[in-house]
């Protein structure tokens, strides 16, 4: 049996990041979004490399429809970006993250 009162738990940080307007410059034209090479926002690749070095779990979030998954994956790969998970088809608009407070005071966000 594990004694959890003496066990040290390392919490891996999770990054949730939107695509359009955050990774790539915003493109309102859906047909261009699906076919054109997207323009990266400055310093995006460097930030992703920093997150990888820190072993963060990266979740891409987007309102892009599921039908654009393959082209979106290719755009991200062609830009030299990597991620652990991608959530597509979210509603347009603000996204709010609500995270818990750990009883021992561990900072989680």
PLM features: residue spans?
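HAD-like aspartate-dependent phosphatase fold
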Residues: 1-109
């Amino acid at each position: 049996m594990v004694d959890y009162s003496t066990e040290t738990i390392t919490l891996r940080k999770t990054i949730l990041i939107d695509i359009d307007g955050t990774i790539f410059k915003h493109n309102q034209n859906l047909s261009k979004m699906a076919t054109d090479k997207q323009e990266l926002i400055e310093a995006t690749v460097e930030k992703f490399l920093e997150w990888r070095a820190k072993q963060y779990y990266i979740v891409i979030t987007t309102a892009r429809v599921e039908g654009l998954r393959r082209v979106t994956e290719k755009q991200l790969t062609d830009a030299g970006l990597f991620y652990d998970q991608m959530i597509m088809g979210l509603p347009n608009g603000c996204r709010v993250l609500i995270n818990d407070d750990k009883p021992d005071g561990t900072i989680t966000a």
